[in-house]
Amino acid sequence: MEKNKRAIGFLLLVVLINGVMMTRSNGYEGEEEWGGAGGGEWGGAEGGGAWGGGGGGGGAWGGEGEGGGEWGGGGEGGGGGRRGWFMMRESRQVIKSEGGEMRVVLSPRGRIIEKPMHIGFLTMEPKTLFVPQYLDSSLLIFIRQGEATLGVICKDEFGERKLKAGDIYWIPAGSVFYLHNTGLGQRLHVICSIDPTQSLGFETFQPFYIGGGPSSVLAGFDPHTLTSAFNVSLPELQQMMMSQFRGPIVYVTEGPQPQPQSTVWTQFLGLRGEEKHKQLKKLLETKQGSPQDQQYSSGWSWRNIVRSILDLTEEKNKGSGSSECEDSYNIYDKKDKPSFDNKYGWSIALDYDDYKPLKHSGIGVYLVNLTAGAMMAPHMNPTATEYGIVLAGSGEIQVVFPNGTSAMNTRVSVGDVFWIPRYFAFCQIASRTGPFEFVGFTTSAHKNRPQFLVGSNSLLRTLNLTSLSIAFGVDEETMRRFIEAQREAVILPTPAAAPPHVGEMVSDRFV
């Protein structure tokens, strides 16, 4: 008898330890794991900032810390809910310069993360340039606000694309690109997914700058090597390499604090037509290389990369507007034919049939807008993990563990980032105070077929009624009335379930 008790006790101890280890490895350590620091304008933790964050201070775009901020958030002074296990709160400020900044919200970690994904927030002041560079990670960018010109090398050719709000563009790892904010007097806000699977192992991603800003990757080569490679004199090389050290985001025209010299890249963007072409020839005086040198065998020849970016040859100059580069795709253009819509809201899902580069990225994109008090019905994604960013309004995210217990019931507001593991049931509910809009990325570029657990198109209506009634322990008529009571599908009217709840109405008016 005593042996049996000890055996049972030992077994219970093993189960308990295993449960704790699984919880930790799955990334459910709770708020301590996610608590980044620093703040900044676009998300983060302590200090808040315009795009909100975790710690004290909040900020205009919501946050988790004390004070809440203009757009609310969790923690003291801003709503909250249960522990935000599926909120992405750990962030790093990777760029800070006179012309803008970039903050990266780090991917969650654990065994249930099938494909890690960081979320980046880039802010650029008017008339600024994100200097030419390439990354060790792929980017899928979404223009949240503003207009820009993207210069990128793809399929061994240089092309420029005009981007506006709603545009999506994929930049593969290793592709040289730059971004120029062309919006008149308007900040450029970009949200991007960052795929670290090809990275060198850095915490966020590693940029390699071609020219200007921080030290160019070219600056590490011996000067005599570069003068030979570029076929220029040493003074000309020094002019290229030492023109500016103002960070990776610089003003095209002189910024708030005038500098002795503007960059070659700034001068380049400020010129037009033939004047630009002549000035570039004067600066670099690059000669035609051998036929072998002109081939972009893998896109990594420094001479050809720079020539391609600057568009020095007549042939490239003529073809830059119609290169092999893919066009962007504007997700707002699909609002006329959304994936689903009713009077309670609409949703748009993009896969590789809509935008071919998504097939190479392995990432899908979605955009959801819920009217005040509406709910995206409880459902699960059988093919992908979902990452979401709140664009407008506020609401609740509810996630359920496989064992049927609540995993998260958290208030979210603008700038918050959340993730939903594959197969986990969840729903989103808009606040009664206004519409709730969020954009996001999925870990599959195939057509997403969410399985709804509630509504007129739910799985319960598809299953055998007799089996269902036995499973729930009720008679068939009761079961039928239960599953047929909701006549709407996908997006449901749920004012009673929507925040703010009783007792929160007064305080939430000021969130």
UniProtKB/Swiss-Prot annotation:
Transmembrane segments: none
Keyword Membrane tagged: no
Region forming the signal peptide: 1-27
Pfam families: Cupin_1
SMART domains: Cupin_1
CDD domains, sorted: cupin_7S_vicilin-like_C (cd02245), cupin_7S_vicilin-like_N (cd02244)
Keyword line: Glycoprotein, Signal
Chain ranges of the Cupin type-1 domain: 86-238, 329-480
Glycosylation sites: 231, 369, 403, 464
Start and end residues of each stretch annotated as Disordered: 54-81
One CC-aspect GO term: plasmodesma
Family note: Belongs to the 7S seed storage protein family.
Protein's job: Seed storage protein.
Official protein name in the record: Vicilin-like seed storage protein At2g28490
Organism expressing this protein natively: Arabidopsis thaliana
High-level lineage: Eukaryota, Viridiplantae, Streptophyta, Embryophyta, Tracheophyta
